[in-house]
């Protein structure tokens, strides 16, 4: 319901998903009648900090203090398998397989982020021709090549590609969020681009 509401609201209206926050604590913990009657405070003292943090994230985003571009790996990140080894037809994505359904749901989430203004980019160690193939021949792909503002599929170190992406988009490295299934790649990026 909140996702649908968020999709239908004008761009200048932002939703603080209190339902999701309260579910983390339970409604008995979230709401305290004493605080409501004393100060008309809808959140218990115990749950006030997460409520304020979530509100601060929304306000921060309004003032440009948030990530602008989500940079994602491809293999075992938006589809199951390695396209260079398994070929596009051998990748796991889509209905009928729990793993494939999870990758499809992740792609749907990424597309929602794009529709809300988050830029999407690819940074993958692959030959570009192999990396592009699933976008062309797999109808289960929710994301299309056109959804990405930058597409780096090569064998350069990922920190180098991330620098290039930031430069192309004219944004700082601190405006990038990097998503990769490989802990070694994440650590390499973390070490080289602190």
Per-range role (PLM):
Residues 1-5, 179, 183-185, 192-194:
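Hydrophobic or amphipathic alpha-helical targeting/insertion segments
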Residues 1-71, 78-79, 84-85, 89:
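Extracellular glycan-modifying ectodomains
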Residues 13, 148-149, 176:
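Short, conserved active-site loop motifs that form the nucleotide-linked donor/cofactor pocket
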Residues 39-46, 91-100, 172:
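The substrate-binding groove and active-site-proximal loops of carbohydrate-active enzymes
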Residues 69-71, 75-160:
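Alpha-helical substrate-recognition element adjacent to the catalytic core
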Residues 136-140, 168-170, 190-194:
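Short, surface-exposed basic-aromatic patches at helix termini and helix-loop junctions that form
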Residues 162-183, 189:
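Conserved Lys-Pro-Asp/Glu-containing loop-to-beta segment of HAD-superfamily phosphomonoesterases
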């Amino acid at each position: 319901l909140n996702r649908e509401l968020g999709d239908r609201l004008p761009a200048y209206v932002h939703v603080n998903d209190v339902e999701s926050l309260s579910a983390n604590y339970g409604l008995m913990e979230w709401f305290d009648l004493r605080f409501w009657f004393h100060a008309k405070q809808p959140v218990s003292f115990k749950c006030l900090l997460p409520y304020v943090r979530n509100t601060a994230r929304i306000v921060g985003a309004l003032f440009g203090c948030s990530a602008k571009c989500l940079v994602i790996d491809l293999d075992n990140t938006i589809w199951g398998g390695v396209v260079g080894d398994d070929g596009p037809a051998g990748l796991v994505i889509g209905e009928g397989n729990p793993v494939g359904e999870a990758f499809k749901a992740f792609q749907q989430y990424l597309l929602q982020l794009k529709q809300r203004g988050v830029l999407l980019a690819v940074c993958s160690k692959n030959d570009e021709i192999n990396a592009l193939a699933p976008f062309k021949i797999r109808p289960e792909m929710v994301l299309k090549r056109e959804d990405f503002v930058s597409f780096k599929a090569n064998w350069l170190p990922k920190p180098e590609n991330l620098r290039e992406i930031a430069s192309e988009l004219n944004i700082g490295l601190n405006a990038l969020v990097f998503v990769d299934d490989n802990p070694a790649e994440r650590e390499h990026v973390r070490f080289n681009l602190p």
